[in-house]
Amino acid sequence: MPFGLTNPPATFQRFMNNIFSDMLDVHVIIYLDDILVYSDDPTEHKKHVREVLRCLCQNELYCKPKKCHFDKDTINYLGFILSQDSLKMDQSKVQTIQDWPEPQKVKDIQSFLSFANFYCHFISNYSDIVVPLTRLTHKGVLWNFSDAARKSFQSLKTAFTTTTPILTHWIPDKQLIVEMDTALGAILSLQFDSGEIHPVAFHSRTFTSPELNYNTHNKELLAIFKAFRVW
């Protein structure tokens, strides 16, 4: 990309989407210059890789061999550890959260939450945990890193290592289970033939001011509505 363009990332992403339009979400995922090729079997995979390399060559785009990984059944892609059976958080990112120093000002909290939010769907009741922290980022709120905020900060760091940090992939022929509660927390899970249940994703958010006035029945309906809207 030449220097001086107004929106080079968006322009390049659009270009990549155009040249790989026939492969996107079929056996290719692309984010800027990070290309992931996936297949159901090794024979098909070699064919798909050749197609990708051919497309790159035809458009005068070239890969550095030292940055390429071939024939992997587990790979680190965009902050996630992807395998045939599961989706995990990048442990180096988790360690960064574990080592994060206690916030001293609002910008520190904003930076921490911005980083942690990337993995929010791995953490059950994430929104409830961070409420004391998000309150401190609201306009007009005086800085006071109270015991509640400190507990929230430590609880979130702990949640990244003590909760279930491994998610399974959605499988079309498996039974889906959606669980929710009146606190707007929800879990999407798969039930396997063995009877075991594994989470696919977690979702949560806090109530808005008007929603806090809902009775229990309406809060439960809202939780169901939001869960099905997300998934």
Task: Please describe what each predicted stretch is.
Residues 1-11, 192-222, 226:
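A short, polar/acidic, helix/strand-boundary loop motif
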Residues 17-21, 59-60, 116-119, 217-231:
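Metal-dependent nuclease catalytic cores in nucleic-acid-processing enzymes
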Residues 16, 21-60, 76-86, 95-98, ...:
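Catalytic palm subdomain of template-directed nucleic-acid polymerases
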Residues 7, 26, 31, 57, ...:
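C-terminal reverse transcriptase regions that engage the nucleic-acid substrate
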Residues 182-191:
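Acidic, metal-ligating active-site segments
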Residues 18-25, 158-166, 208, 230:
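Conserved helix-loop functional segments at active or binding sites
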Residues 2, 88-89, 178-180:
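Short hydrophobic beta-strand that contains or immediately precedes a catalytic carboxylate
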Residues 174-183, 224:
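Two-metal-ion RNase H-like nuclease active-site motif
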